[in-house]
Curated annotation (Swiss-Prot):
GO terms for biological process: translation. Residues 44-73 are annotated as: Disordered. SUPFAM superfamilies: Ribosomal protein L4 (SSF52166). Belongs to the universal ribosomal protein uL4 family. This is Large ribosomal subunit protein uL4. GO terms for molecular function: rRNA binding; structural constituent of ribosome. The gene is rplD. Keywords: Ribonucleoprotein, Ribosomal protein, RNA-binding, rRNA-binding. The lineage of its organism: Bacteria, Pseudomonadati, Pseudomonadota, Gammaproteobacteria, Enterobacterales. One of the primary rRNA binding proteins, this protein initially binds near the 5'-end of the 23S rRNA. It is important during the early stages of 50S assembly. It makes multiple contacts with different domains of the 23S rRNA in the assembled 50S subunit and ribosome. One of its GO terms (cellular component) is ribosome. Part of the 50S ribosomal subunit. It comes from Serratia proteamaculans (strain 568). PANTHER family: 50S RIBOSOMAL PROTEIN L4, LARGE RIBOSOMAL SUBUNIT PROTEIN UL4M.
Length: 201
């Protein structure tokens, strides 16, 4: 199949298996959820009534005081007591096979092509690391919410994009399922397309 280069009156021949496959929603959902779960720190911790510092003595006698009965100052009902179902550090990561991960990326890229959200250009760069230059370039292309993927990370482009809202610049090694679906448009250089095909072959 062929994809049109926006900045040149020509087309780029690409692999049908990478950019023209059916959308597997279940697979994409599973991989995206697993990717997001893997980003969780999982370090939160609370103390149960067994771990809270405090006396084991019964605060007051069982009957005769007129107050509600109580057996411990560490009760979850009490202020500064333990937590009933205390959170503990845990690993939230989920296993995703390479075949599944690559399949999800291919599925997302193919859907981007179908929805006209993938824009292929011969090259994408700015003369200097100036936000103003990149902002004007994106305005000329009618792009706002965009992920820019280049073959090799362009330092000028990277620095120029840092202060722009909803604009991100990555090289091919830096793309992932979440970033590809998070932006309204994805701009990819011809060099990046070839690298993606090699990576997902």
């Amino acid at each position: 199949m062929e994809l049109v280069l926006k900045d040149a009156q020509s087309a780029l021949t690409v692999s049908e298996t990478t950019f023209g496959r059916d959308f597997n929603e279940a697979l994409v959902h599973q991989v995206v959820v697993a990717y997001a779960a893997g980003a969780r720190q999982g370090t939160r911790a609370q103390k149960t009534r067994a771990e809270v510092t405090g006396s084991g003595k019964k605060p007051w006698r069982q009957k005769g005081t007129g107050r509600a009965r109580s057996g411990s100052v560490k009760s979850p009902i009490w202020r500064s007591g333990g937590v009933t179902f205390a959170a503990k550090p845990q690993d939230h990561s989920q296993k995703v096979n390479k075949k599944m991960y690559r399949g999800a990326l291919k599925s997302i890229l193919s859907e981007l092509v179908r929805q006209d959200r993938l824009i292929i250009v011969e090259k994408f760069s700015v003369e200097a690391p100036k936000t103003k230059l990149l902002a004007q370039k994106l305005k000329d292309m009618a792009l706002e919410d965009v992920l820019i993927v280049t073959g090799e990370l362009d330092e000028n482009l990277f620095l120029a994009a840092r202060n722009l809202y909803k604009v991100d610049v990555r090289d091919v090694a830096g793309i992932d399922p979440v970033s590809l679906i998070a932006f309204d448009k994805v701009v990819m250089t011809a060099d990046a397309v070839k690298q993606v095909e090699e990576m997902l072959a």
